[in-house]
């Protein structure tokens, strides 16, 4: 297993890993445009470094020479701009640039926000997600953030237990695309713990 920063050339391999997470969120965009169109648009947008899932905002786990999982996030103060590159991709594909994947605010102030943690379906149960989670403190600290935040669906108690076990605490709630989420945070001590 090897974790490294995502690269622009990873875009086509990352998109199908992230897509099931977006599908589970029941985003209106997917219902409107379908999985294949969304995958194509997502792959194009990942090549933009400033995008929510832009390669410069992500790390990937390589297993057996392939991307087994990915984690994407950003400092909370970047949230207002993270979807602008997707609007450009929509225009390039002659689609309405106001029809973004996400419309809700997700981050809490002054945190490095883990937007998405995704593991390829065939790689689940191999510790990929936990390895990516353990790598995040270094990512957050490199961006001068001493707190990591994330949202976990209230309907997913297993994930909530995992994050709790890894030191995250529930600090609030969010409603995203009609689903209720626990907002959890982990405070770092400067050494990544």
Sequence positions of predicted segments:
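A short helix-loop-beta-strand connector motif used in the catalytic cores of GNAT acetyltransferases and
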Residues: 47-60, 77-81, 113
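Conserved beta-strand in the GNAT
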Residues: 60, 66-75, 113, 118
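A short beta-loop-alpha structural element at the N-terminal edge
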Residues: 2-16, 24-28
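Conserved acyl-CoA
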Residues: 105-110, 120, 131-147
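C-terminal "cap" of GNAT-fold acetyltransferases
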Residues: 110-111, 145-160, 165-167, 172-193
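Conserved acyl-donor/pantetheine-binding loop and adjacent beta-alpha core of acyl/acetyltransferases
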Residues: 77-112
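Conserved GNAT-fold acetyl-CoA-binding loop/helix
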Residues: 23-46, 57, 91-94
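Conserved acetyl-CoA-binding loop-helix of GNAT-fold acetyltransferases
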Residues: 125-138, 161-165
